[in-house]
A protein has these predicted regions:
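Small-molecule-sensing regulatory modules
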Residues: 1-55, 74-103, 112-119, 124-334
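Acidic/His-rich segments in extracytoplasmic proteins that coordinate ligands and/or metal ions
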Residues: 60
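Aromatic- and charge-enriched surface segment that lines or borders ligand/interaction sites
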Residues: 68-69, 77
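Periplasmic solute-binding protein
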Residues: 106
C-alpha cells in the first residue's frame, strides 16, 4: 500500500533566467530559499517550515505538478500552456510574477522580404506550391495558432535546442520561438512577423488542483504564498512618500492634497502634527504613490507648500484578503 505523502513540495527552475529570477523574487517576497550545497537539487524555505524545494527543468515542473508529485511550481507561462494542453489537473495561481518576460513569435528569414504578416506567409506557401515547415518547441500552441490563421497544412517539426539555424540549413521554412530582446534574431538574419505574436509569457505560480481540494495543508500553503507574493508585487510598483506641509489643520492639508491628481494615496493621506521649534503649524503627510508618478507627486507636494520630502521603498502592501486567493476559491468551485 502506497504511503500518503504529507510533505509539501515546491518545484523551482534548476537553471537559466528563471532559476535566478525565482530565487530573487522569493527573497524579495520574504520567502528566501536556503540551498547550502549548490550541487544539490533540494532546498528549504526557512520561513515555511516543512516545505521542500525541488529544482527541476521548467517543463518537468509542469509535469510533476500535473501528476501530483509536486504541489506547487514556478515555471514559464509559455511552458505551462504548452504542457497542459487540454488538461485540468493543475491550475495557475498567479500568472504574472514580474520576471522572465518574453513572447512566443512566428519568425521568418530576412531573405523572404515579401513576407511581413501571416497573410503574406499564406501567399508565400501558395507560391511554393507545397506545405510550409515550422520548427518549434511548442507544437500544441503552434498547431492551434496556425490553424486559426489559415495555415492548417503547415508541417510542425518538433525540435529542441537552438532553432535559429533551422531556416538557414533548410530544416524548416520558419520557426516559432520565444523572444525576449530580439538580438539573437538579428544576429541570425531572422525577424518577427508584424502579427505573429502567439503568446505573452512571464514566470507563473501553478498548483495541483486535487491537492488543493483534498489536502488542507496545501490550501493553507497556497494562501501563505499568495499573501506574500501578491503583497510584494503590489508594493514593487509603489514608493512611500513623506512631506512636511504648513497649514491650519489636518483637514485643510487633506483638502489641498485631494485637489491634486497623484498624491491622494491608497485610501487617502495619513496626516499628523509636527512638533517643531518654528512658529506656525506644520503637519507631516504620508502617502503611497506609484513609482512611475514619483516626480509628479513631488511637484504636487511642492505646489501646496510641501518640503523635506522623503521617499522610501515599500516592501509589502497587504489587502484585507489577497485577490488571487479569492480567485482560487472561485476556480475550485467550478
Amino acid at each position: 500500500m502506497k504511503t500518503k505523502r504529507t510533505e509539501l513540495r515546491i518545484g523551482l527552475p534548476s537553471k537559466g533566467r528563471l532559476f535566478d529570477g525565482s530565487l530573487d523574487f522569493l527573497a524579495k517576497a520574504g520567502l528566501s530559499v536556503y540551498k547550502p550545497n549548490p550541487r544539490q537539487y533540494e532546498a528549504t524555505i526557512p520561513a515555511l517550515p516543512g516545505v521542500l524545494v525541488l529544482f527541476q527543468r521548467v517543463g518537468d515542473i509542469v509535469v510533476s505538478v500535473e501528476e501530483g508529485s509536486v504541489d506547487f511550481g514556478i515555471t514559464g507561462w509559455d511552458t505551462y500552456r504548452e504542457r497542459t494542453y487540454n488538461s485540468s489537473r493543475s491550475m495557475p495561481l498567479l500568472k504574472n510574477l514580474g520576471f522572465g518576460s518574453c513572447t512566443l513569435q512566428v519568425i521568418v528569414p530576412e531573405s523572404i522580404r515579401e513576407v511581413r504578416t501571416l497573410s503574406d506567409l499564406a501567399v508565400y506557401r501558395n507560391n511554393l506550391a507545397r506545405p510550409l515547415r515550422a520548427a518549434t518547441k511548442f507544437p500544441n500552441l503552434t498547431r492551434r495558432f496556425l490553424d486559426e490563421n489559415g495555415l492548417t497544412d503547415t508541417k510542425i517539426i518538433e525540435a529542441e535546442g537552438t532553432l535559429e539555424v533551422a531556416p538557414a540549413i533548410g530544416y524548416a521554412d520558419f520557426i516559432i520561438d520565444l523572444v525576449s530582446t530580439g538580438t539573437t534574431l538579428r544576429d541570425n538574419h531572422l525577424r518577427m512577423l508584424e502579427d505573429g505574436e502567439m503568446l505573452r509569457s512571464e514566470a507563473c505560480l501553478i498548483a495541483n488542483r486535487a491537492a488543493l481540494k483534498e489536502r488542507p495543508e496545501v490550501m493553507a500553503l497556497a494562501r501563505t504564498l499568495l499573501e506574500f507574493m501578491e503583497a510584494h508585487l503590489r508594493a514593487s510598483t509603489t514608493v512611500s512618500v513623506f512631506a512636511n506641509i504648513r497649514g491650519e489643520s489636518p483637514e485643510t492639508i487633506a483638502d489641498l492634497i485631494f485637489e491634486q491628481d497623484v498624491i491622494g494615496g491608497l485610501q487617502g493621506p495619513t496626516i499628523s502634527p509636527v512638533i517643531n521649534r518654528e512658529e506656525g503649524d506644520w503637519f507631516a503627510a504620508h502617502i503611497i504613490v506609484q513609482r512611475k508618478d514619483l516626480y509628479a507627486a513631488i511637484r504636487e507636494l511642492r505646489s501646496i507648500g510641501g518640503s523635506g520630502v522623503v521617499v522610501t521603498p515599500v516592501t509589502y502592501i497587504f489587502e484585507e484578503e489577497p485577490v488571487s486567493y479569492k480567485n482560487l476559491l472561485e476556480q475550485l468551485e467550478e
